[in-house]
Amino acid sequence: MDSREIVERTITYTAPARLAATLPEPYWNDLVHVNYDLPGFERAWREVRPGRQEYVDEWGNTWARVDRTSKGEVSRGVLESWERLETLTLPDLAHPAHFQRVRAVCAQRDETRFRVGGLPGFPFNVARKMRRLDQFLMDLLLAPDQVAALLRRVEDLLAEVIVQYAEAGVDGVMFPEDWGTQLSLMIHPDMWREVFKPGFSRLCAVAHDRGVKVLMHSCGKITAIIPDLVEVGIDVLQFDQPQLHGIDILAQFHGQMTFWCPVDIQKTLQTQDERQIEAEAQELVEKLGGPDGGFIAGYYGDNPSIGLEPHWQYVACRAFVRYGDYARAAV
């Protein structure tokens, strides 16, 4: 059973041979990420003054950061005024020529990992940057018609991108969409259902109709809409803070949703206690996964930003491997 089949069986709850994982060497990584190219665009940070870097993204948004490791945040959106909406030009992400490298990776016979095409987000993650998050959240109440028009344009573009990925041969598409704070969803769940859920349903259907799985990353406590995400067709939820939801709460979705998590980066890893880290790794495997599937073990890729030496995640990796040997566990 190769990596692709292990991930597929994990997502569909059809008995993978072992734990699916995205761990660094000397362990295993069952996923390979492939992305479209944008000729002429380079994400290059430039120093605008001491201690501040900026770059302009493919949408026209200006990003800023005050360190050298984080992804930064939008400081000026391309759509500062709704008067520009009708003339706003979106990048041609879905041009077939941009997927040549994706097609090449998917055509490699020796590439046996689960192939995941990257999306810039679903409509919220794209639109909120064009207006800046603070303004966009106000727009939901103050300019609902303009918000709906912008979301639809972005949704149409993303649907085309998903089609191109499917035709290139990917197994899944993945998008980031940070919907939560430490306490709850950023907006009332009913508003999310009214404004955003239809777009989720449509884009998941575009993927599923072409045999492509949908993977979503989100930070924050979005527990209130997990049942909705199951309903619309999200196949995998990638959480870096599983303790924020409660592992026992997530376990209630066993059989309906696959979770992909490292040991909690905010709480458990920060203890730098090997016993606690190992115990959570075991709990994640046994409560969210197991021999029938449902869990992918993760590794947070930016140790400097969480203030930890790699050692502490390697403690988690060893525990994931130990408890993810389903054949041995069955003996």
PLM regions: where:
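Short aromatic-enriched loop/helix-cap "lid" or pocket-rim segments at secondary-structure transitions
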Residues: V32-Y36, D67-T69, K129, E309-W312
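Residue-level detector of functionally special positions within alpha-helical transmembrane segments
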Residues: D2, P39, D57-G60
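A contiguous, low-structure linker/loop signature
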Residues: P50-F99, A107-G117
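Short acidic, Pro/Gly- and aromatic-enriched capping/linker segments at domain boundaries
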Residues: L38-Y55
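Active-site loop segments of alpha/beta catalytic cores
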Residues: M1-P26, T89-V331
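Short, basic/low-complexity N-terminal boundary segments at the transition from targeting/disordered tails
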Residues: L19-R43
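Glycine-centered secondary-structure boundary/capping sites
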Residues: Y13, V32-D37, G51, G60
